[in-house]
Amino acid sequence: MSTVLVGFDFSTGSAYAVDLAIDIANRMQMDLMLVYVKTKDEDETPIRAEIERRNAGVAHLLNGIKMDYVIREGKVSQELCAQAKDCDAQLIIVGTHGMSGFEKNWIGRNTYRTIAESDVPVLTIREDFNFKKSLERIVVPIDNSSDTRQKVPVAAKFAKLFDSELHILGLYTSDNTSIRGIVDGYVHMVDTYLEKAEVKHVCTCVNVPKNLTVTTLEYADSVDADMIVIMTEQESSLTSFLLGNYAQQMLTLSHRPVLSVRPEQVNSVSK
């Protein structure tokens, strides 16, 4: 059975990630794998005891799936991605502390690198997210880049799992009629795809007066969205593994879960 993998470090954010991961894994009918990446000097015994204690506390929530854990040593991003390959993970979920958390570098170092290096989509969850409600509305921004639509099958999969409504947000980054026409065409194609797939959705196009991130987040606020789906390849740097400004800003500023998808990842959780 395929697996949903969760990066775990005993933080509030990672505990929330486990909660949502259990829900997602139950709906996908995939096993759940928790991964703790320790430093060289950490004693594994108390780590193992605490993970087993916490797992026992949520075991009753599992619906026909298994939950296991593994303790690895090394760099967080490398070990998470390696474990994802080892257990045929279709999705990685990580909790983040955000810019106000006790470990500011987590969002800048471990999360960014995990997303950039991962072969599967990565769902990041902030510890200030409201987990009392389901994923009712999911925002899918569409720009004029050639691969912007490739995140739609993954978003549609989540929408069907949670009976969510997709909000397709066309982003006009220019007054140029050709560029706006490309966005309109892509939104129309997505609309047709989702109609055939019988996925609830609405389509909206807006101007981008500031930047893509701010406009997307303002729209997400206006519809009380529960998740945002972005592509990472189109924003990635050509000279390094680091994500581009749009993805970095979205991951840092969004208090909602962000699902980051690369073009070659569309066949994983969208199956």
Where are these predicted regions, by residue range?
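Short helix-capping segments at alpha-helix termini
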Residues: 58-65, 194-199
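Small/aliphatic-rich secondary-structure junction motif
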Residues: 1-47, 137-186, 191-205, 222-227, ...
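Charged docking surfaces used in two-component/phosphorelay signaling
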Residues: 71-79, 208-213
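Gly/Ser-rich helix-loop-strand patches that form or flank binding pockets
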Residues: 81-130, 221-271
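Short, well-ordered secondary-structure micro-motifs
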Residues: 45, 105, 135, 151, ...
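A conditional alpha-helix N-cap/helix-loop micro-motif detector
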Residues: 14, 73, 104, 148, ...
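Rossmann-fold cofactor-recognition segment
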Residues: 66-69, 203-205
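Active-site phosphate/pyrophosphate- and oxyanion-stabilizing loops and adjacent acidic/basic residues
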Residues: 22, 56, 112, 156, ...
